UniProtKB/Swiss-Prot annotation:
Its EC number is 2.7.7.27. Keywords: ATP-binding, Carbohydrate metabolism, Glycogen biosynthesis, Glycogen metabolism, Nucleotide-binding, Nucleotidyltransferase, Transferase. Involved in the biosynthesis of ADP-glucose, a building block required for the elongation reactions to produce glycogen. Catalyzes the reaction between ATP and alpha-D-glucose 1-phosphate (G1P) to produce pyrophosphate and ADP-Glc. Disulfide bonds: none annotated. The lineage of its organism: Bacteria, Bacillati, Cyanobacteriota, Cyanophyceae, Oscillatoriophycideae. GO terms for molecular function: ATP binding; glucose-1-phosphate adenylyltransferase activity; structural constituent of carboxysome shell. It comes from Gloeothece citriformis (strain PCC 7424) (Cyanothece sp. (strain PCC 7424)). This is Glucose-1-phosphate adenylyltransferase.
């Protein structure tokens, strides 16, 4: 795998994940209590023996930069690296990244300095575990110019993805990016060609691109230079290449979830608590997911009732009830609290006992979840200060709300408390 260079696309402004992307790049959004989204593709690369990795970003990349430099520091005299490439303006390219393909085009000069055969292009906001060695092996065996990783998908979600038709040799013969209406129905295929059972094929009559591509080095360079007006892989580069190049589809059979929206992000995190076996597990010794070592103390649990939940290290929990929830590092929950169906991202630092006492005496709200508070179906971003006897339960069953000046938003019925926000004592949301 030394002949492969990985390129992870950090995505755009992350508007669908706002406000989680208000102060951070999309790949830096916390996941499962202690990880970040970027840890998934980087870990998959490392476990697949791919250690030349670029991450392309444009928005709020400071925390992502910090996380990657502290986590994936390959030392020694070798060619292993994980490096962030932020959008920049040059004499040749006076504008920012205009799309996924344009982002790669603007740094193609740097990527071509590496003596590799293939470029593996990945997305920074997917949850899955994949051995890219098998994927690359299939690409080489079929003598493909481009190979797309694909999954069968149902009609409900199909219009959110690039869809394709393939022949008996898994060659892509038609491709349409996020089709709607009649164009969507025309992309229906018999997915039993992928080896699905008749019942599975009926439920999933579409073949969707995962947004994961392998390009031969010369092919990518040629496509990007010959089509400077084309800025997106899914909308322009891939559909335009299907006639002149050998495009192959590679079926991925494991769990895969695009977590680019608040609802998908929320559901994917809480699914990790599923019993007896969650759809995705971080407990895999053969293919671990890596993240920054923080050297935090064990979580302190004082007379709590905790069911179907994941509690990260360094938390302090007192006389509370936690059900079907994920608690991030350094989470603090005071007595008589109830946390249900929620994700608490925790904190970046501890507030000392002396500081907490001074904050309370000043009539302000200390970090963490105050006594007597109830939180249901919510995402609480890092360093939030939730007062005493607060109800975050979406009392009026509102689907969408913009209350950023009050420290929260509602997306798909999920209350999202913004990073560093303060919710005063007695507030009812």
């Amino acid at each position: 795998m030394k002949r492969v260079l990985a390129i992870i696309l950090g995505g755009g402004a992350g508007t669908r994940l706002y406000p989680l992307t208000k102060l951070r790049a999309k790949p830096a959004v916390p996941l499962a209590g202690k990880y970040r989204l970027i840890d998934i593709p980087v870990s998959n690369c490392i476990n697949s023996e791919i250690t030349k990795i670029y991450v392309l970003t444009q928005f709020n990349s400071a925390s992502l930069n910090r996380h990657l430099s502290r986590t994936y520091n390959f030392t020694g005299f070798n060619d292993e690296f994980v490096e962030v490439l932020a959008a920049q303006q040059t004499a040749e390219n006076p504008s920012w990244f205009q799309g996924t393909a344009d982002a790669v085009r603007q740094y193609l000069w740097l990527m071509e300095e590496w003596d590799v055969d293939e470029y593996l292009i990945l997305s920074g906001d997917h949850l899955y575990r994949m051995d890219y060695r098998e994927y690359i092996q299939r690409h080489r065996e079929t003598k493909a110019d481009i190979t797309l990783s694909v999954v069968p998908i149902d009609e409900k979600r199909a219009s959110s993805f690039g869809l394709m038709k393939i022949d008996d040799n898994a060659r892509v013969v038609d491709f349409s990016e996020k089709p709607k209406g009649e164009a969507l129905r025309q992309m229906q295929v018999d997915t039993s060609i992928l080896g699905l059972s008749p019942d599975q094929a009926r439920k999933n009559p579409y073949i969707a691109s995962m947004g994961i591509y392998i390009f031969n080095r010369e092919v990518l360079g040629k496509l990007l230079r010959q089509n400077p007006e084309q800025t997106d892989f899914g909308k322009e580069i891939i559909p335009g290449a299907k006639t002149d190049y050998n495009l192959q589809a590679y079926l991925y059979k494991g769990y895969w979830e695009d977590i680019g929206t608040i609802e998908a992000f929320y559901e994917s995190n809480l699914a990790l608590t599923q019993q007896p076996q969650p759809p995705f597990s971080f407990y895999d010794e053969k293919a671990p997911i890596y993240t920054r070592p923080r050297y935090l103390p064990p979580t302190k649990v004082l007379n709590c009732t905790i069911t179907e939940s994941m509690i990260s290290e360094g938390c302090i929990l007192k006389d509370c009830r936690i059900h079907h929830s994920v608690l991030g590092i350094r989470s603090r929950v005071e007595s008589d609290c109830t946390i249900e169906d929620s994700m608490l991202m925790g904190a970046d630092y501890y507030e000392s006992s002396t500081k907490r006492k001074a904050v309370l005496e000043a009539g302000k709200v200390p970090q963490g979840i105050g006594a007597g508070t109830t939180i249901r179906r919510a995402i609480i971003d890092k360093n939030a200060r939730i007062g005493r006897n607060v109800l975050i339960i979406n009392k009026d069953r509102i689907e969408e709300a913009e209350r950023e000046d009050e420290g929260f938003l509602i997306r798909s019925g999920i209350v999202v408390v913004i990073k560093n926000a303060t919710i005063p004592d007695g507030t009812v949301i």
